[in-house]
Amino acid sequence: QISGPSAAVMYWNQREKSRHTFMGEWTRSGDKYTRDADGYYHYCGRSDDMLKVSGIYVSPFEVEGALMTHEAVLEAAVVAHADTDQLIKPKAWVVLKPGLAASDALADQLKQHVKDKLAPYKYPRWLEFVAELPKTATGKIQRFKLRG
């Protein structure tokens, strides 16, 4: 929750959304942060983008960041995806650097790369190679199109 003189007070003509978002002087932003041992805050994404895998929250940004450290990856996006048992797991869309070709072997290598960087439950169970990620005019990834 946040508060301050620049915070909005309501959504225009959206009473129910306003009621759930604005509580007196406080605004429930939907942004998730962690605080490190030195007191610094680190942005982890939106609460509606967070994945709950095996009962533990996973930031898609964290998985994307791990994928981005691989030499073949130009861009990555991660969203929640249900497996055959309807359990939520990470699914990744990856744009490769120019001149590189997608393959099952590379997909397996990228999954292992994430396992080596993060806790094993965070690795993407599915990985799709795409030419580009869907984005807004300002360059933000349109995750809702990937969930679709």
Question: Which positions does each model-derived feature cover?
Answer:
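General small-molecule cofactor/ligand-binding pocket signal
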Residues: 127-130
